[in-house]
């Protein structure tokens, strides 16, 4: 596919789209019209590119990769696709003839409301990597009408508003109503035998129609085009009998209940209705996707005997685990396979990535809910459990192990156990995480099937997070080491040769300052707060969760504030702390931490005693676009989770590749960042995973730390006295006896690490060299590397285009 366009061709195409789709001339068109016109041009080009890519795959009979995830945090598509297809300059000049600036078109596009945190952003990065490396791949998720939510901070308290992203975002979507499939819930299972053939039908079920919409994702230079297929839930039709009998509300209510499935990502599950909706969402995604995959496969081959040879199905975390019993259902009920044959096809086809060691994230569903909502899937799951129990017993003779590894136990369905049992490969997402899976989380499984476990450390789309987000740094790198790093992140290693070049270090410092000035202007506009670009920009941006320990950061900030108040004439390095994070709607403690940080910010930012020394800002509604402005401006990357709780992290990689220095624990991918940059270019603090486990074993008593550390006492006592008239008993009042993530245990070491960071920052040459070494060491965290490892070790395939 030739993606080249001249300025004249682009101008004509824009005018054509404006006329045909919106009925306006270039003179009448708004910026919104121009944005959509350019998006439609790109969408059409990528659609054609995908068609050619598909024909090549068909001709080569290459293996197809299907990647299922509950969320894909795509961000904006216009800038990314223009960059990848090398059309940025053309589309800068073409609209200019109409008096239109491309930068303003970028701002017309909303972030696609299809994801929440690191899991979804990783999935989005992998679609980019798959396309850029030339693999034929398709992602599957749900078309969430209102996204996750828009975060609004009202007096410091997170309030959730619907994210109306589709009016501006649906221009990238191509509907395929002709490929819609039916998804069945509830009902009862009717089984019969006919000449040794087992007939199974679900009777009196509630049917929802899944309608697919395709979004295209370009690889660099258009080498490949990935597709993200998004399913929208539609009612099968209006019950006209009910409507004609005057029961209008009930007729409409049936439709609304069907379509609520694709309204919002991760509805609160603090109540039975929320749990039921989440399970419906998961089965809706899985059933629609598996039906689609099998339909496509049968169209090409006419059999599923060769399924595992021709496709790889990858489940990203436990949300799509129902792929396993759903594929079994199709093979048993629709294709007539016997159990053993079907199970071999499933386990040879499916692979699973685990993303957490947190117990609450290893999903379990109440057995009665599962049975009522998915009766046939429940039957199959029970049979999987029975046979797997027999397998474990025959392998080990250990009744305790059988029970721990069971899929159905104590009234719940354990999704993580089903994922491991039904996959041919299970991987963690950092070296440390994969070891924890083997030694702790899935210890029993590892003892029975050790060959099933492997590691693929996460990666990021470095072309987005470096080349697009930080054009000045990209320009400097290209001038010094060539543009090879754009295609192969490992080439960033060459930048190490300039670690002692004073002019290069000076240039790095100047680029960082300009990025900080840009962020300061954005914060002034959004928050009305003045930031000092010459201060340390200390950044913690990620999902709000207790294990990520945003409150440890806040405790230290409060400690510093109290120190300044005690000694206002002391020598303090100007320090700006930047937070951005959303809390899950039903996660009260996370919301309380946000409120605490906002109250702290209000206290500090309005106190003349600390003016010019300390500033705290909480940026609301954190998303990909905000992150693209934050990452290049950060000096310090806060990665301070309790060791042994973070699977990997990818924010640490995005900050690293933009020259931020990691201040963190030896957790997740921090371990590999430390390995990449060495002791001198990272600031490590806190207990190791082994030390955390040892402390838990002997009994962790946070009160000891409170009693023996004056700084901790001052901080906790101050919190308990209230901040700006607000009290935080859940934070200050409980932490001395309930501190599950050991904030007080790591506090003293964290404070020392912060002091070390300030001293290093004051030595500009040393700090700039540290920054350079982080950029040069970040290449190993490119998603291209991760994708090639998945392809080699798990999917067993090679790129279609090299």
Each language-model region and where it sits:
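A conserved ligand/cofactor-binding region detector
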Residues: 1-802
């Amino acid at each position: 596919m030739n993606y080249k366009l001249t300025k004249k061709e682009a101008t004509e195409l824009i005018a054509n789209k404006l006329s045909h789709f919106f009925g306006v001339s270039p003179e009448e068109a708004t910026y919104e019209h121009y944005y959509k016109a350019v998006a439609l041009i790109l969408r059409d080009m990528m659609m054609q590119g995908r068609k050619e890519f598909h024909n090549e795959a068909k001709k080569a009979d290459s293996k197809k990769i299907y990647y299922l995830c509950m969320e894909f945090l795509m961000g904006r598509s216009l800038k990314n696709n223009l960059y990848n297809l090398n059309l940025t300059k053309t589309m800068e000049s073409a609209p200019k003839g109409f008096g239109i600036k491309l930068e303003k078109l970028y701002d017309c596009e909303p972030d696609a409301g299809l994801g929440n945190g690191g899991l979804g952003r990783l999935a989005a990065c992998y679609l980019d990597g798959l396309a850029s490396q030339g693999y034929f791949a398709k992602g599957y998720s749900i078309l969430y009408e209102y996204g996750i939510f828009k975060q609004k901070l009202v007096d410091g308290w997170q309030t959730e508003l619907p994210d109306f992203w589709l009016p501006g975002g649906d221009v990238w979507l191509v509907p395929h109503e002709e490929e819609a499939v039916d998804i069945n819930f509830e009902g009862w299972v009717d089984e019969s035998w006919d000449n040794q053939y087992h007939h199974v039908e679900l009777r009196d079920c509630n049917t929802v129609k899944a309608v697919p919409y395709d979004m295209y994702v370009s690889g660099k230079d258009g080498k490949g085009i990935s597709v993200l297929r998004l399913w929208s839930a539609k009612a099968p039709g209006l019950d006209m009998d009910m409507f004609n009998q005057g029961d209008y509300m009930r007729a409409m209510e049936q439709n609304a209940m069907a379509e609520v499935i694709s309204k919002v990502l991760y509805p609160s599950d603090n109540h039975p209705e929320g749990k039921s909706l989440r399970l419906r969402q998961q089965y809706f995604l899985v059933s629609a996707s598996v039906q689609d995959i099998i339909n496509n496969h049968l169209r090409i081959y006419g059999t599923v005997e060769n399924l595992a040879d021709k496709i790889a199905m990858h489940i990203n975390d436990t949300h799509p685990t129902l792929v396993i019993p759903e594929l079994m259902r199709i093979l048993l009920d629709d294709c007539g396979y016997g159990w053993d044959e079907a199970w071999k096809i499933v386990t040879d086809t499916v692979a699973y990535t685990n993303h957490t060691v947190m117990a609450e994230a290893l999903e379990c569903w109440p057995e009665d809910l599962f049975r009522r909502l998915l009766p046939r899937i429940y039957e199959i799951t029970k049979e999987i459990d029975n046979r797997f129990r027999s397998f474990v017993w025959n392998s080990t003779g250990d009744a305790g192990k059988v029970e721990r590894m069971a899929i159905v136990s104590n009234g719940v369905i354990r999704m993580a156990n089903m994922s491991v049992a039904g996959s041919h490969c299970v991987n963690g997402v950092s070296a440390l995480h994969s070891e924890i899976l083997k030694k702790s989380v899935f210890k029993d499984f590892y003892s029975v099937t050790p060959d099933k476990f492997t590691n693929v450390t996460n990666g990021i789309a470095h072309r987005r997070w470096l080349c697009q987000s930080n054009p000045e740094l990209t320009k400097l790198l290209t001038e010094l080491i060539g543009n090879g790093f754009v295609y192969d992140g490992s080439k960033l290693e060459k930048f190490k040769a300039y670690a002692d070049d004073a002019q290069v270090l000076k240039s790095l410092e100047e680029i960082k300052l300009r990025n900080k000035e840009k962020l300061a202007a954005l914060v002034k506009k959004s928050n009305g707060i003045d930031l000092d670009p010459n201060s340390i920009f200390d950044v913690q941006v990620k999902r709000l969760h207790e294990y990520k320990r945003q409150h440890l950061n806040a405790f230290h900030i409060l400690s510093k504030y109290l120190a300044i108040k005690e000694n206002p004439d002391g020598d303090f390095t100007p320090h700006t702390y930047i937070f951005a994070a959303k809390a899950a709607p039903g996660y009260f403690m996370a919301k309380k931490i946000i409120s605490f940080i906002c109250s702290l910010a209000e206290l500090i930012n309005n106190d003349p005693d600390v003016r010019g020394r300390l500033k705290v800002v909480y940026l609301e509604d954190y998303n990909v676009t905000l992150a693209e402005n934050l990452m290049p401006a950060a000096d310090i990357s806060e990665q301070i989770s309790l060791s042994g709780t973070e699977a990997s992290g990818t924010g640490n990689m995005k900050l690293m590749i933009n020259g931020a220095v990691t201040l963190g624990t030896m957790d997740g991918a921090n371990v590999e960042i430390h390995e990449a940059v060495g002791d001198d270019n990272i600031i490590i603090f806190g207990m190791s995973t082994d030390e955390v486990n040892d402390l838990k074993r002997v009994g962790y008593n946070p009160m000891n730390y409170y009693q023996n550390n004056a700084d901790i006492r001052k901080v906790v006592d101050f919190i308990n006295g209230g901040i700006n008239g607000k009290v935080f008993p859940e934070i200050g009042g409980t932490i001395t006896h309930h501190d599950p993530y050991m904030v007080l245990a790591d506090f003293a070491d964290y404070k020392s690490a912060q002091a070390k960071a300030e001293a290093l920052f004051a030595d500009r040459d040393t700090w700039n060299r540290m920054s350079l070494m982080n950029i040069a060491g970040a290449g190993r965290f490119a998603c291209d590397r991760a994708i090639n490892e998945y392809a080699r070790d798990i999917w067993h395939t090679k790129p279609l285009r090299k």
